[in-house]
Amino acid sequence: MEDLGENTMVLSTLRSLNNFISQRVEGGSGLDISTSAPGSLQMQYQQSMQLEERAEQIRSKSHLIQVEREKMQMELSHKRARVELERAASTSARNYEREVDRNQELLTRIRQLQEREAGAEEKMQEQLERNRQCQQNLDAASKRLREKEDSLAQAGETINALKGRISELQWSVMDQEMRVKRLESEKQELQEQLDLQHKKCQEANQKIQELQASQEARADHEQQIKDLEQKLSLQEQDAAIVKNMKSELVRLPRLERELKQLREESAHLREMRETNGLLQEELEGLQRKLGRQEKMQETLVGLELENERLLAKLQSWERLDQTMGLSIRTPEDLSRFVVELQQRELALKDKNSAVTSSARGLEKARQQLQEELRQVSGQLLEERKKRETHEALARRLQKRVLLLTKERDGMRAILGSYDSELTPAEYSPQLTRRMREAEDMVQKVHSHSAEMEAQLSQALEELGGQKQRADMLEMELKMLKSQSSSAEQSFLFSREEADTLRLKVEELEGERSRLEEEKRMLEAQLERRALQGDYDQSRTKVLHMSLNPTSVARQRLREDHSQLQAECERLRGLLRAMERGGTVPADLEAAAASLPSSKEVAELKKQVESAELKNQRLKEVFQTKIQEFRKACYTLTGYQIDITTENQYRLTSLYAEHPGDCLIFKATSPSGSKMQLLETEFSHTVGELIEVHLRRQDSIPAFLSSLTLELFSRQTVA
């Protein structure tokens, strides 16, 4: 809105300017040129120039306003484009995440489908193997049935032979009515038994058909394990029926006994042939009875017709046998077939029990392996946590080393200030002695640092090996997880790998304990080195000055040391020469003459003793100053501060009611900038102050000051 107002003002000023110029032009044209003075022309020219300048300014302002408008529009368009781009980017990112999630879901589904396909293939292979076994069993059963058919054919031949014998007996027994009647009665009984046997065969055929139907149903439902139990129940019912059949087949021995009796009678009839001569005498009497025998022959013809009918039934039975595919012609064959079915059923039950037992064992092994995997993963997590704690401890130790180096530098500065107060005459022997001690300490520190660096390198190598082993363990865990997933599908995971993993875990635990001990030793050595003035070369940089007094002093000490070594060698040579009793070389005599006298040695000893006394005084002064500083802090703050353990400080108030009333603070940060109040018996009595000043305000000085005021008020009230 402000831009529109400015634009309208610019347009109005432009219009007024144009009107003014047109009026001036018209007025100027009406005037006479001769009457106008040159001064008025100059004024008009100046005014016209000013008006043109104003017009230019107004035009430039309008142009600037238009440019600013275009700029604002461009910025708005850029903002809109950015917003649209950000929206498009967010939508594309969301779509990408959705696509990634969908891909992951599809991958998981594909894996599940692959696993299901593998399981289905395994089940199909198992079913094919079972079908092959069933086919083999059926082939064996068909072979047995063929053998039984052969045995039935032999039995038919024997029956035909018996028929021939019966015909012979009829011709021989024509003259014996009583015997023929008995034979006829026996034949009738045999026919009845045959009828019973035919009925039993029909029932057996029906049962065989039922068994075939059950076999077909079982072959159709073998793919499903659950339906096997139902089939087993059906087979048990069939077994009960077969048992009933067995009870009926027990009657077969009685028929065999009757056959034996018939054979004995045939033998007896053979003997009767011998007595045929005697029977011929009775032939006349038997001719009278011929009419009766003719009637008997008619009955025999009827019996033969019935026999033919029975033979037709036998042939139809054999045809049914061939059409059904089961070679069962006798009850014995049926009993054998039933026994085979029972044996197959028992074998299937044994296989089922073996499969279930193996599945249970594999399931138990899988569960044990899963537990072992969980234990190994837990141990790995513990190892990682311990490694993190060790790294944190190493960082704390490094920070502590830095603090100790700072304290050492402060102590050196204090000692330097005390040394600066000494006179130059007293300073030089003390400096030389201190430089010697410093050089010895430097050599010791260098040697110790070399040892520590070697130990640190070994520890780092061992840590690297430990990390590699941890990585190997992680890879083995991943392999174990993949193997456990495959074991859940196929149950083929072995316990040997679990035992090896246990051994590896035990070895790693031993190595971890050993590394922890080495780490503790290294931490102790680092503390000692820090107390001795060592520093971390990777983090602390030492600057060496070109004209360093310490380097000059060291150079002098080295020169003095070399001179002293040369003098010692000369003195040793002198002693050897004197012991041998030979002449002393001139250079050794000169060296002996140049040695310091006993007075100089006594003076040097006095200087050393005075330096030691000065150091002792400095230590005493330092201790007294520290005591004074602590007393001043105690009187000023009202709290006595004592260091109990590492990073723990005990504060005892000046106005404490009991000597055991104290507060314990623990430094949570290495620099000591953050403190944490530990729980004590006295802290339970000041819970309100802790809640107000520490938890809400987070101010330890306010808490301590309020605590001193409260204790002071208690003492004054008391």
Curated annotation (Swiss-Prot):
Effect of R360Q: In a prostate cancer cell line; somatic mutation
Positions of the UniProt region annotated as Necessary for interaction with NEK2: 380-532
Variant or mutagenesis effect after changing R572H: In a cancer cell line
Molecular function (Gene Ontology), one example: kinetochore binding
Coiled coil feature spans: 46-632
Keyword Lipid biosynthesis tagged: no
The entry's keywords: Acetylation, Cell cycle, Cell division, Centromere, Chromosome, Coiled coil, Cytoplasm, Cytoskeleton, Disease variant, Isopeptide bond, Kinetochore, Mitosis, Nucleus, Phosphoprotein, Ubl conjugation
Residue numbers spanned by region Important for interaction with IK: 301-340, 439-480
Location in the cell: Nucleus; Chromosome, Centromere, Kinetochore; Nucleus envelope; Cytoplasm, Cytoskeleton, Microtubule organizing center, Centrosome
Modified residues (Phosphoserine): S16, S214, S428, S598, S610
Effect of R556C: In a prostate cancer cell line; somatic mutation
Cross-link (Glycyl lysine isopeptide (Lys-Gly) (interchain with G-Cter in SUMO2)): K61
Region (Necessary for interaction with MAD2L1): 540-551
Induction text: Increased by p53/TP53.
Motif Nuclear localization signal, chain ranges: 79-82
Residues with PTM Phosphotyrosine: Y634
N6-acetyllysine modifications at: K61
PTM-bearing positions, type Phosphothreonine: T716
One Gene Ontology biological process: cell division
InterPro entries according to UniProt: Mad1 (IPR008672)
Effect of Y634F: Reduces binding to closed and open conformations of MAD2L1. Does not impact the duration of mitosis
Residues bearing the modification N-acetylmethionine: M1
Subunit relationships: Homodimer. Dimerizes via its N- and C- terminal regions. Heterodimerizes with MAD2L1 in order to form a tetrameric MAD1L1-MAD2L1 core complex. Interacts with the closed conformation form of MAD2L1 (C-MAD2) and open conformation form of MAD2L1 (O-MAD2). It is unclear whether MAD1L1 dimerization promotes the conversion of closed to open conformation of MAD2L1. Formation of a heterotetrameric core complex containing two molecules each of MAD1L1 and of MAD2L1 promotes binding of another molecule of MAD2L1 to each MAD2L1, resulting in a heterohexamer.
Function: Component of the spindle-assembly checkpoint that prevents the onset of anaphase until all chromosomes are properly aligned at the metaphase plate. Forms a heterotetrameric complex with the closed conformation form of MAD2L1 (C-MAD2) at unattached kinetochores during prometaphase, recruits an open conformation of MAD2L1 (O-MAD2) and promotes the conversion of O-MAD2 to C-MAD2, which ensures mitotic checkpoint signaling.
Protein name: Mitotic spindle assembly checkpoint protein MAD1
Organism expressing this protein natively: Homo sapiens (Human)
